[in-house]
Amino acid sequence: APPEPVYPGDDATPEQMAEYVADLRRYINMLTRPRY
């Protein structure tokens, strides 16, 4: 599995937060994708 995205912190810029959320979604999708 890919490494879990690191939370950028409470003082992160909106761009950093958006990138983190996108990475987190991709990470969760990889974890929950069924493996046939």
UniProtKB/Swiss-Prot annotation:
Residues that span the membrane, as ranges: none
The protein's name in its UniProt record: Pancreatic polypeptide
UniProt family annotation: Belongs to the NPY family.
Natural source organism: Oryctolagus cuniculus
Cellular-component GO terms for this entry: extracellular space
Gene from which this protein is expressed: PPY
UniProt keywords, alphabetically: Amidation, Hormone, Secreted
GO MF term list: neuropeptide hormone activity; neuropeptide Y receptor binding
Record-level GO BP terms: feeding behavior; neuropeptide signaling pathway
Top-level taxonomic group: Eukaryota
